[in-house]
């Protein structure tokens, strides 16, 4: 057992009432005992909270280590969850019994479904969240989770031991060293460090170490990871200034009201806590040429923009937007930070100009002429680890039982972090009990696409989820995430409660029964026209028309269909969610059949496992170029399907790999079957003797 670095410099760490005793005395000895857990989670952000609670739900004794307990659940940047693609992740996290979706439903102040003009497969569930309420509700949930201990403290180093021979990796993590020199041991460790790895905050030309405004960065842990051999990169992000609510002239701005009724994030909720009529509006304004002028004239005062470090492509700073898209007007959404908050978040105005120039720029914008900046915008630069160094279970290739989740893997956004956190927590727990990993494939969920993109393609800029990244988005909809993942989460991972599992089973059987009934009801087109006059069905059709086909029409829903045919359809309208999901299933029925065939083809590729111990650099049984060997050696794909998605791995290389896998499988099968074959021959000889 060894520490990677020395423990010569330590500072005192503060602890809360929720701490475990760092020294425990056994009944027969006065010697101190070191605390031991099944899983340790480092970091209390959106990935860390989901990872810790997921591991605890799976039955593991879990420790959540965070710099400060009072920052658990803090929304460091935007006061919102969800959006296009991100709303799908929220539903999938909820399907695995994650926290953030339920907490959002308790804390939302403005709900909106984006992409309503398009089909339900790409609807984006989104909500403005009360920062204070969200943090309170999350902390209450975390501090009352069974098997979960919360501890304040900073991790300085990892405790490493000899690797398990049956797994890849040059060593195994078995605990952590805190900044005060104390040690805590565990079977698995999850890093969810966010922007804290060598984090630097930037405002204008000023830079100072911080993982977040007011919080110290993690230096020692970053050095440990680098010395272990992990490929480390550098990314940056930013946040807008906060504006005093009473200094804004809302009367001249475009007002956006919330949806009524609100669509909850969680499958367990039919409604949200704050009623639509009590929710808050958002307001829209735009930048102008004066904003461009201030940005362009002061680039020399902005070190964050001059840095070569890559920032988020899909959430750029106002400086980046002006440079990339000159002479354009850019949207600025004025979003409330809470029911009782005096602050407004100007979405679209992330900036790192000097503080005095930030207020000067903001007062150039319509409606903000008298705006007061309460907190300046700032940028953050931080370390991340190339995600091609982790497996689809989020365990690292280099260090056994060490898992990464969140921004450490190069992603951006609360939802992407939460999704990784759930998977890391589940797999860290399964690793302790030596069970197979829980992997979501590209054909099963947006979470699968997210992790597959990271582990096979990597990223050189903050990764954001979009519906356009998903090949099978008609099948992977927000409405059916429970059918896709809850059943698996219960059976394969043990992370889902009995109540949620039973609800998902009921919904699945109700949908199957409802679709079967809708298929069985057939009338002529003229009769349907008489029953539902508003439907634009052609009366020239000679064949009978199923009720399921009638439900596909935009003007028809389950209520109108049940009025036309009360028996047996009336019972399917009693549950609003069931009625809406039957409508969606009918809408996509014809295209889903073809997509399911494509999914089966992909699943066949994913079923072809590559040997875990294969050495791509030296193996001679397969013809591969040097470049392909290096790419495969670095990414270490687990299946033929994953290998085919790595840039630079040619179709010819995939064919050669496929031949190698099949030959290996045949050899293994022959070795396994040879004793059975000999026994069969002996039995046949004896039978022939008896017959003679």
From Swiss-Prot:
Positions of FAD binding: 43-48, 155, 218, 407
Cofactor: FAD
Chief site of localization: mitochondrion
One CC-aspect GO term: cytosol
Positions of post-translational N6-methyllysine modification: 508
Compartmental location: Mitochondrion
Top-level taxonomic group: Eukaryota
Organism this protein belongs to: Macaca fascicularis
Catalytically driven reaction(s): 5,10-methylenetetrahydrofolate + uridine(34) in tRNA + taurine + GTP + A + H2O = 5-taurinomethyluridine(34) in tRNA + 7,8-dihydrofolate + GDP + AH2 + phosphate + H(+)
Alphabetical UniProt keywords: FAD, Flavoprotein, Methylation, Mitochondrion, Transit peptide, tRNA processing
Family designation: Belongs to the MnmG family.
Bias (Basic and acidic residues): 683-692
Span of the transit peptide along the chain: 1-25
GO molecular function: flavin adenine dinucleotide binding; tRNA 5-taurinomethyluridine synthase activity
Region (Disordered), start-end ranges: 669-692
Protein name (Swiss-Prot/TrEMBL): 5-taurinomethyluridine-[tRNA] synthase subunit MTO1, mitochondrial
Subunit comment: Homodimer; forms a dimer in the presence of potassium. Interacts with GTPBP3; forms the GTPBP3-MTO1 complex composed of homodimers of GTPBP3 and MTO1.
Described function: Component of the GTPBP3-MTO1 complex that catalyzes the 5-taurinomethyluridine (taum(5)U) modification at the 34th wobble position (U34) of mitochondrial tRNAs (mt-tRNAs), which plays a role in mt-tRNA decoding and mitochondrial translation. Taum(5)U formation on mammalian mt-tRNA requires the presence of both GTPBP3-mediated GTPase activity and MTO1 catalytic activity.
NCBIfam families xref list: mnmG_gidA (TIGR00136)
UniProt xrefs under InterPro entries: FAD/NAD-bd_sf, GIDA_C_N, MnmG, MnmG-rel, MnmG-rel_CS, MnmG_C, MnmG_C_subdom, MnmG_C_subdom_sf
């Amino acid at each position: 057992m060894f520490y990677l670095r020395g423990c010569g410099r330590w500072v005192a760490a503060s602890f809360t009432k929720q701490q475990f005793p760092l020294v425990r005395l056994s009944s027969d000895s006065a010697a101190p005992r070191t605390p031991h857990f099944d899983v340790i989670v480092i970091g209390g952000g959106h990935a860390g909270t989901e990872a810790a609670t997921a591991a605890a739900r799976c039955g593991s004794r879990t420790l959540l280590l965070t710099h400060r307990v009072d920052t658990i659940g803090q929304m460091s940047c935007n006061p919102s969850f969800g959006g296009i693609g991100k709303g799908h992740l929220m539903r999938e996290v909820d399907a695995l019994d994650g926290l953030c979706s339920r907490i959002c439903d308790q804390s939302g102040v403005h709900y909106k479904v984006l992409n309503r003009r398009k089909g339900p497969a790409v609807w984006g569930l989104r909500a403005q969240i009360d920062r204070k309420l969200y943090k309170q509700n999350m902390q209450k949930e975390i501090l009352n989770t069974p098997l979960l201990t919360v501890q304040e403290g900073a991790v300085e180093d990892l405790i490493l031991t000899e690797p398990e021979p049956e797994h890849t990796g040059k060593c195994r993590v078995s605990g952590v060293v805190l900044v005060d020199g104390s040690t805590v041991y565990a079977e698995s460790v999850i890093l969810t460090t966010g922007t804290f790895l060598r984090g630097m905050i930037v405002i204008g030309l000023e830079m100072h170490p911080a993982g977040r405004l007011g919080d110290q960065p993690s230096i020692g842990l970053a050095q440990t990871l680098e010395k272990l051999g992990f490929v480390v990169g550098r990314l940056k992000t930013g946040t807008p200034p906060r504006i005093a609510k009473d200094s804004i002239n809302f009367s001249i701005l475009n007002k956006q009201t919330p949806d009524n009724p609100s669509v909850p994030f969680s499958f367990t909720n039919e409604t949200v806590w704050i009623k639509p009529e009590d929710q808050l509006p958002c307001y829209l304004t735009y930048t102008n040429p004066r904003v461009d002028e201030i940005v362009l004239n002061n680039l020399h005062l902005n070190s964050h923009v001059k840095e070569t470090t890559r920032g988020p492509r899909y959430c750029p700073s106002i400086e980046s937007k002006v440079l990339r898209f000159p002479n354009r007007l850019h949207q600025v959404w004025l979003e409330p930070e809470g029911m009782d908050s005096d602050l407004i978040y100007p979405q679209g105005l992330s900036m790192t100009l000097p503080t005095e120039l930030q207020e000067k720029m903001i007062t150039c914008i319509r409606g903000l002429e008298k705006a007061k900046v309460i907190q300046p915008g700032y940028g953050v630069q931080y370390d991340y680890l190339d995600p091609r160094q982790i497996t689809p279970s989020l365990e690292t290739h280099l260090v056994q039982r060490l898992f990464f989740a969140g921004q450490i893997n190069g992603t951006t956004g609360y939802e992407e972090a939460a999704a990784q956190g759930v998977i890391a927590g589940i797999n860290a727990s399964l690793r302790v009990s030596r069970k197979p990993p829980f992997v979501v494939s590209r054909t099963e969920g947006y979470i699968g696409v997210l992790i597959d993109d990271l582990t096979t393609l990597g990223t050189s800029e903050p990764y954001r989820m979009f519906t356009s990244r998903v090949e099978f988005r008609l099948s992977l909809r927000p409405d059916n995430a429970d059918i896709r993942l809850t059943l698996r989460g219960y059976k394969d991972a043990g992370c889902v409660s009995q109540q949620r599992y039973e609800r998902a089973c009921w919904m699945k059987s109700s949908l199957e029964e409802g679709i079967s009934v809708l298929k069985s009801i057939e009338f002529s087109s003229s009769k349907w026209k008489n029953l539902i006059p508003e439907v634009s069905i052609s009366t020239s059709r000679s064949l009978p028309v199923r009720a399921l086909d009638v439900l596909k029409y935009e003007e028809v829903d389950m209520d109108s269909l049940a009025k036309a045919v009360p028996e047996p359809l009336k019972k399917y309208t009693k549950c609003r969610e069931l009625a809406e999901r039957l409508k969606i299933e009918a809408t996509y029925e014809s295209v889903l059949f073809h997509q399911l065939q494509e999914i089966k083809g992909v699943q066949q590729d994913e079923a072809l496992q590559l040997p875990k111990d294969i050495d791509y650099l030296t193996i001679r049984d397969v013809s591969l170029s040097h470049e392909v060997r290096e790419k495969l050696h670095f990414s270490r794909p687990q299946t033929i399907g994953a290998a085919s998605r790595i840039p630079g791995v040619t179709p010819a290389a995939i064919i050669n790999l496929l031949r190698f896998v099949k030959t290996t499988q045949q050899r293994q099968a022959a070795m396994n079957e040879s004793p059975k074959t000999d026994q069969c021959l002996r039995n046949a000889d004896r039978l022939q003797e008896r017959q003679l």
